[in-house]
């Protein structure tokens, strides 16, 4: 076989298999052979096919290469299969270069019989043995089995014999090897519709297959291969190629069939694929690097991955990449694409800033600080921090909500003539209004004295000398009840002395229970002088004691490093700055079980004891929007039976791990090898981390404190001395609850326990060797009066610290996709004022709930009646989303699962505008059962509110029962 070979894809007007068999058996069928496409192997042929017209024909006749005629394969793995081999005769060359039909006589004259039947002899022998049942003899007459095989006729004579005697079976065998369903339209539709892809994609896909990409990808790659070629001299158009004669002439005369455009096409495709993979590799490398170093919550990391791809491969970036790899000179190499570099500059450089706390704060956080004169600062501290916390005996009151409501109402009536604004009567009379007492208590406790002898606080407590402001506490009672307390001072030694008390049953008496379980209520009207972090670690496995101690030292270091950046004018030595760490006591028997290596006790079916309501963290997923700090009336209005601990959900018991969180906090130390067993916390571990705001600063506003907590969590995630020892033990990296920093939310204080059906347990105790002052209430209350003078007030923490990825994604949606109608405008078109709280609540209860009720009736049998007559109370309002809690005459049962003891589920609805610019209402629930995620918010379904806003005009569009 000649070293230079041309492979030809041919077609016939009739059945190509029958036509080919007739040629192979020496017959001369009617009709002609048409060259559809061809490719060559051998460097010498590149020169021949680069010559124009007649010179190319002369060069091919001089070189006399072999020509293999092929048909398409019947299976995808074999795209073309050879049928016969011929010499490059003048007729064959004209068929290649001009697209002229090749007569059967010309094919027979050019056919190389030996080379041709070398392709088919194996098939001919196999067919002969099967069809004529040739078998070697056995037994006494046995002889060499290869002898009858030698006697089988092969070549043209053998094929002719088979074709004559077994025509049907022979045709069937060849049709299993070769495809025979191709028409001119099939080629144009599959490889066209334009000339370049019809010629080049056919050649490259069939003769130069690549397993890495398919035909669609090949055609896309050729879109940027644009060599200059002359117009097709055939004068034909791809849409008019209705016969193989026209198709052959069009393809063989095309400028893409010969010359530099054809010679360099395969090389260009390979280089283009390498260029694309190189740019994709840059993206993969960045993501792989960040996967190990960028500690993000799972949901946020998924957002990051999608966002990285969008930033790298959005329309603008892809257009730049395609312009860079586009070529007009076939011999030119593929250009260098800026895709990876632009992605690094536009996106990943900002991500890298998330990996260094100094860069993170510098690029993403913009603090706003007000400077006060010393006298003004002293007045600010006097009006905005607790006047007193310590006293020889408790000075104040503690009672259930109903009793306090009557007392507050009486006090407001006494103060009304002096300008006090009373709560509206209808607010006090609506269902669940007893909870509004908390908001009213916060107002009375924070009302400044203004130099008057009688104050609102004094009137409330019956203590004329009581100086405001005063702390407000929530007290957990037995059987999921609660009480509230307002104290102008307390004997804190009584509380801290109980640190070693054994677990006990919860009491019903508020005054006694106040020293067992107490939660400080956040008052957004007061200044924050202690940063108190509610830290909950969800564990993949128990943490060894030494590892935990080392990790918490890293935690403290990260917090102080970040605060040093956020408060650059702070006085004092950061290495000596106090940072108090308190840990929730382990479950009873947990430490023994851990030491013995036994598994923790199995939970109940629904986990009601394991996962009680965590009301102070229940809406952490929702956050709080500016201007919505006044929804404490809703928070406290929920019956106390749904209240329990606010922070960690750790379990029951006493005890804690040792450590030294205060020693050498800012000096890196190696993680000590520790053989001590882990503590008894096996699934969750709760901490309270408290550090005073440094002199001369104070912090104002719930949003500011919430922002500080987010920045501090990011700082902890970037601290190697925390993440390296602790990372393998954590299920996720969201452990600082920022939802507690909202007006009316409460957080359990150190030295106090949580309460549920199992009694009082999980007391927050000092972790390790606590620094001096760990038992001083001025060091773990949000609004305690500082010992230093205040001349700087941090009142805003702007920037992108909240969520770099979410904000970036929001900008991309605004830049690349259609803008949605603002929710306020959508509601305004329905004659509803989004700023009018009562009108909005009435709209939800009377109109928007209609599709929700119909969907409940259709898909949740027996549940719709629970929602009949339900009212809606606004919880959170954001520009594009408003959340309401539903309040019904009865409890709402869980819609996600059936529970043995029918636990109540907190139910919400949210108004928003979807991607199709439709007003939608979504129903979601929080169920405290373990199988439902232990208070995790789950959307049950979403329905569209019809534009007519009538109960008949609203229709449900989608649902998911989870």
Swiss-Prot record:
Keywords: DNA replication, Host nucleus, Metal-binding, Transferase, Zinc, Zinc-finger
ZnF locations on chain (CHC2-type): 894-932
Highest taxon of the lineage: Viruses
EC number: 2.7.7.-
Catalytic class of the enzyme: transferase
Site features described as Essential for primase activity, chain residue numbers: 534, 536
Name of the encoding gene: UL52
GO biological process, one term: DNA replication
Subunit text: Associates with the helicase and the primase-associated factor to form the helicase-primase factor.
Protein name: DNA primase
Main location group: host cell
Matches recorded under InterPro entries: HSV_PRIM
Described purpose of this protein according to its UniProt entry: Essential component of the helicase/primase complex. Unwinds the DNA at the replication forks and generates single-stranded DNA for both leading and lagging strand synthesis. The primase initiates primer synthesis and thereby produces large amount of short RNA primers on the lagging strand that the polymerase elongates using dNTPs.
Chain segments annotated as coiled-coil in the UniProt record: none
Single annotated GO MF: DNA-directed RNA polymerase activity
Organism listed in the record: Suid herpesvirus 1 (strain Kaplan) (SuHV-1)
């Amino acid at each position: 076989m000649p070293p230079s070979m041309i492979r030809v894809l041919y077609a016939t007007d009739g059945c190509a298999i029958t036509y080919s068999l007739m040629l192979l058996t020496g017959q001369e069928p009617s009709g002609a052979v048409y060259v559809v496409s061809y490719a060559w192997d051998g460097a010498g042929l590149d020169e021949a096919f680069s010559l124009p017209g007649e010179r190319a024909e002369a060069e091919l006749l001089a070189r006399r290469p072999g020509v293999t005629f092929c048909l398409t394969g019947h299976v995808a793995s074999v795209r073309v299969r050879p049928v016969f081999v011929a010499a490059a005769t003048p007729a064959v060359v004209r068929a290649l270069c001009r697209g002229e039909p090749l007569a059967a006589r010309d094919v027979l004259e050019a056919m190389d019989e030996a080379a041709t039947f070398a392709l088919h002899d194996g098939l001919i022998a196999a067919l002969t043995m099967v069809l004529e049942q040739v078998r070697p003899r056995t037994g006494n007459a046995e002889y060499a089995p290869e002898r009858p095989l030698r006697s089988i006729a092969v070549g043209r004579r053998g094929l002719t014999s088979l074709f004559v005697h077994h025509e049907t079976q022979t045709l069937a065998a060849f049709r299993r090897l070769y495809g025979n369903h191709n028409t001119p339209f099939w080629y144009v539709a599959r490889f066209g519709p334009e000339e370049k892809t019809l010629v080049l994609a056919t050649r490259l896909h069939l003769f130069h297959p690549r397993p890495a990409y398919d035909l669609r990808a090949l055609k896309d790659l050729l879109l940027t291969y644009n060599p200059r070629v002359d117009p097709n001299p055939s004068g034909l158009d791809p849409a008019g190629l209705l016969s193989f004669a026209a198709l052959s002439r069009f393809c063989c005369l095309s400028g893409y069939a010969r010359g530099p455009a054809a010679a360099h096409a395969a090389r260009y495709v390979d280089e283009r694929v390498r260029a694309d993979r190189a740019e994709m590799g840059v993206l993969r490398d960045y993501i792989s690097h960040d996967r190990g170093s960028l500690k993000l919550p799972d949901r946020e990391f998924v957002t990051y991955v999608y966002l990285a791809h969008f930033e790298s491969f959005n329309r603008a970036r892809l257009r730049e990449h395609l312009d860079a790899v586009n070529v007009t000179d076939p011999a030119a190499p593929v250009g260098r694409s800026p895709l990876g570099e632009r992605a690094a500059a536009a996106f990943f450089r900002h991500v890298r800033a998330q990996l260094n706390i100094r860069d993170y704060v510098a690029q993403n956080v913009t603090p706003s600080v007000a400077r006060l004169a010393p006298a003004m600062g002293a007045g600010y501290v006097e009006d905005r921090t607790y006047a007193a916390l310590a006293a020889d005996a408790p000075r104040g009151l503690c009672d259930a909500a109903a009793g306090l409501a009557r007392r507050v109402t009486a006090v407001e009536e006494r103060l009304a003539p002096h300008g006090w604004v009373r709560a509206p009567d209808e607010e006090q009379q609506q269902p669940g209004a007893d909870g509004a007492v908390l908001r009213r208590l916060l107002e009375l406790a924070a009302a400044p004295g203004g130099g008057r002898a009688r104050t609102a606080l004094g009137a409330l407590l019956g203590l004329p000398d009581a100086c405001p402001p005063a702390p407000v506490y929530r007290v957990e009672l037995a059987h999921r009840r609660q009480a509230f307390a307002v104290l102008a001072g307390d004997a804190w030694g009584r509380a801290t002395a109980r640190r070693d008390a054994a677990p006990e049953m919860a009491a019903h008496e508020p005054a006694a229970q106040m020293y067992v379980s107490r939660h400080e209520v956040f008052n957004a009207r007061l200044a924050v002088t202690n940063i108190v972090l509610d830290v909950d670690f969800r564990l993949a496995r128990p943490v060894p004691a030494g590892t935990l101690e080392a990790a918490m030292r890293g935690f403290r270091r990260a917090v102080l490093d970040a605060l040093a950046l956020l408060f650059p004018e702070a006085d004092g030595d950061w290495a000596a700055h106090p940072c108090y760490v308190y840990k929730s006591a382990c479950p009873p028997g947990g430490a023994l079980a851990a030491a013995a290596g036994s598994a923790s006790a199995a939970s109940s079916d629904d986990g009601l004891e394991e996962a009680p309501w965590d009301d102070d963290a229940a809406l952490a997923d929702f956050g709080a929007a500016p201007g919505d700090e006044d929804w404490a009336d809703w928070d406290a209005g929920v019956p106390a039976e749904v209240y329990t601990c606010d922070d960690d959900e750790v379990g029951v018991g006493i005890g804690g791990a040792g450590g030294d969180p205060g020693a050498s906090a800012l000096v890196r130390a190696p993680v000590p090898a520790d053989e001590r067993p882990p503590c008894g916390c096996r699934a969750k571990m709760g901490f309270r981390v408290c550090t005073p705001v440094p002199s001369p600063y104070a912090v104002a506003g719930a949003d500011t404190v919430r922002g500080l907590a987010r920045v501090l969590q990011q700082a902890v995630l970037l601290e190697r001395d925390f993440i390296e020892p602790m990372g393998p033990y954590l299920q996720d990296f969201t452990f600082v609850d920022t939802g507690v920093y909202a007006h009316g939310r409460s957080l359990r204080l150190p030295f106090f326990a949580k309460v549920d059906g199992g009694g009082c347990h999980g007391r927050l105790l000092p972790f390790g060797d606590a620094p001096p002052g760990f038992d001083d209430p001025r060091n773990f209350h949000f609004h305690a009066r500082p010992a230093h003078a205040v001349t700087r007030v941090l009142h805003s923490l702007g920037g992108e610290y909240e969520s770099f990825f979410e904000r970036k994604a929001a900008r991309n949606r605004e830049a690349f996709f259609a803008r949605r109608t603002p929710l306020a405008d959508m509601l305004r078109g329905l004659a509803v004022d989004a700023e009018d709280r009562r009108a909005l609540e009435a709209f939800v209860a009377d109109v928007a709930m209609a599709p929700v009720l119909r969907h409940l009736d259709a898909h949740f049998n027996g549940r719709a009646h629970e929602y009949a007559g339900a009212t809606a109370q606004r919880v959170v309002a954001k520009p594009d989303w408003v959340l309401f809690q539903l309040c019904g005459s009865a409890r709402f049962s869980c819609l996600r699962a059936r529970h043995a003891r029918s636990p109540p589920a907190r139910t919400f609805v949210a108004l928003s505008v979807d991607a199709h610019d439709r007003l939608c209402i979504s129903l979601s629930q929080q169920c405290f059962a373990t199988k439902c995620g232990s208070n995790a918010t789950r959307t049950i379904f979403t329905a569209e509110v019809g534009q007519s806003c009538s109960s008949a005009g609203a229709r449900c569009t989608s649902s998911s029962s989870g």
